[in-house]
Regions:
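Charged, low-complexity intrinsically disordered terminal segments
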Residues: 1-215
Length: 215
């Protein structure tokens, strides 16, 4: 599954049909249509790979030559990804299936895919609860997670992001954390791939630095 807008200039038209002919099931999430609708803003920017319910990969890495530095449009490309094993993989399976089933067609017996992770249980001292924001949500789960972490941080909060677009509530949480002694650091790229987002982020720098946040 790939996003209709995110891949509009990088993939050939009807690429999904080409994949289908190769035996690969493929769907386009929220394809672009020539109609004015707020649904055109519903996009899925997540990158999820789940293998047999045992292993999940997630992060910021797209399937693109830039991410393995075969193409150097903006210098050496650095991104973050992680691998997860165990029952928590079921969370990523559920997130994928939720988007996959947005269309009329549905996978029969989705529980089969969710339950597959139970046999790969891993014994550890901690726990992992995957979560995600989707265009289907009425609650901004990701934003709430950030705010909760900032409000509960006692020593430090380090954030690395390519795009820094924050509202007043998020700014106040960052500012308050820094003012009560939490070490708040934000890492941003110096060479942007999206110039408008780069210059928008810089409009926050002065106030963030004044609050004691390092960038």
């Amino acid at each position: 599954m790939y996003d209709g807008m995110g891949c509009i200039v990088t993939l050939p038209r009807k690429y999904n049909e080409y994949l289908e002919r190769q035996g690969i099931k493929c769907r386009i999430f929220s394809p672009i249509v020539p109609l004015l609708s707020t649904h055109q803003n519903n996009r899925d920017h997540r990158k999820i790979m789940v293998i047999d319910g045992a292993t999940a990969f997630c992060g910021g890495i797209n399937i693109s030559d830039e991410y393995i530095n075969e193409k150097m449009r903006f210098g050496h490309w650095k991104d973050t990804g992680f691998m997860l094993r165990g029952e928590a993989v079921a969370g990523f399976t559920a997130m994928f299936l939720e988007m996959w089933n947005v269309n009329d067609e549905h996978i029969e017996d989705c529980g089969e895919y969710i339950q597959a992770s139970k046999k790969y249980s891993v014994s550890t001292d901690g726990f992992v609860i995957p979560f995600g924001d989707t265009p289907l949500d009425e609650v901004y789960v990701g934003k709430r997670a950030y705010i909760n972490n900032l409000n509960n941080a006692s020593e430090y909060t380090y954030i690395m992001t390519p795009y820094l677009v924050i509202d007043d509530e998020m700014y106040e949480c960052m500012k308050y954390a820094a003012q009560r002694g939490v070490d708040v650091k934000i890492i941003m790229p110096h060479i942007p791939d999206k110039k408008y987002a780069f210059y928008l982020a810089r409009t926050y720098y002065k106030e963030l630095l004044k609050a004691g946040i390092e960038i």
